[in-house]
Each structure stands twice: as C-alpha cells, then as structure tokens.
C-alpha cells in the first residue's frame, strides 16, 4: 500500500472486468481485512493509487499510432466510472499530449489495438489506469464511431501477405467482438457511425 502512495488506495481483481472486482481501501483495518481475505482465496489483486477525479475517466481506443475515438465516462453511484456500473458516457476529443500518452501506453505492452483508460487528477495531470487488449464495444453505441473500420484499415495497410510478427495475436479478441452483428458482412459494409 505504501508503494502506491498509502490510503486510500484502489484494489482491482486481475480477473475482473467492467468495474466488477474494483474496490476502494480507505482505512488500515479495511485494507488488512480485504487483502487478507483475498489472499486466502488465492485472488490476484493489483493496487493502485487513489486519484481524485470526480468519478470520471476516459476510455481511448488506440489503433496503431492514433486514437480512433475517446469517451469520457462518469460514475453515478461511487468512484467507478464504468458504464456497466450505471455510469454515463459521451464522446470527447483528446489533447495531443493525452493522445501521445494513450498511444505510448499501448505500445509499452506491444499492442497495436487497445482500450486505454486514463484519468485526470484535480490539478489536470493525466494518469494511465489500465490498458485493455479487448476493450469492448459500448463506446461504439455511445459515441457513434465504429472503431473497427479504423482497425481493419490499419491492418490492411500494415500487414503484408505472409508476413510474420513477434507481437502477440489479437485475432481472438477481434473475432469475439466481431462475432456480433457484423461478422457476415464485409468490413466496408459495417456501420460507420
């Protein structure tokens, strides 16, 4: 806990998603009880510094060296800003500095396609809080921007037939997401929103 700046701190179960398994540790007693229980359950937990952000964060979809679309998420019930936890979202434009932060965060873990979550503290400093190789599709419905069109264009312009890469494959992530309504249509017929 001291390594992340003390309490309050955020705990995240490593196998959680959409805000499930994210909790705040506010007191030494609460932290000790929660972490001891999770340890006994063999649960893997990541601790992060708690950053006052007004229960808002930003999800940016990175495709190659660009941010395809970004959405601000605002929490309604607690500190979590996840849409699936009752939050709301709206399309936003990022500053050049925040675009660079998001692209570099994806590159740091060798991803050409990622959802990068950032938030700003009360002074406006940007923090990367998560990089996700399978970012989901709610952002398409909320922003009206289908980032899969950008992703396919990126793949078409950057992959040579027969070329091999040392990067981990994201094909399984893309196929799961694409398995919804667009799978049987050519990519150029997907909704462009």
Q: Model-found features: residue ranges?
A:
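Active-site nucleotide/adenylate-binding loops and adjacent lid/helix of ATP-dependent enzymes
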Residues: 1-51, 55, 96-99, 193
């Amino acid at each position: 806990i001291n390594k992340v700046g003390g309490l309050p701190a955020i705990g995240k179960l490593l196998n959680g998603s959409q805000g499930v398994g994210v909790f705040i540790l506010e007191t030494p007693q609460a932290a000790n009880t929660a972490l001891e229980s999770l340890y006994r359950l063999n649960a893997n937990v990541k601790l992060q510094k708690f950053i006052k952000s007004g229960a808002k964060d930003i999800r940016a979809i990175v495709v190659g060296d660009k941010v395809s679309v970004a959405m601000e998420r605002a929490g309604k019930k607690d500190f979590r800003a996840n849409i699936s936890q009752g939050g709301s979202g709206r399309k936003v434009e990022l500053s050049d500095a925040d675009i660079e932060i998001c692209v570099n965060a994806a590159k740091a873990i060798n991803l050409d396609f990622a959802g990068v979550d950032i938030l700003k503290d009360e002074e406006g400093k940007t923090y990367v809080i998560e990089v996700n190789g399978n970012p989901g599709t709610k952002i398409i419905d909320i922003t009206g921007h289908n980032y899969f069109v950008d992703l396919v264009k990126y793949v078409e312009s950057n992959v040579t037939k027969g070329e091999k890469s040392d990067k981990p494959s994201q094909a399984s992530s893309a196929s799961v997401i694409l398995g919804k309504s667009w799978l049987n249509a050519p990519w150029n017929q997907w909704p462009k929103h």
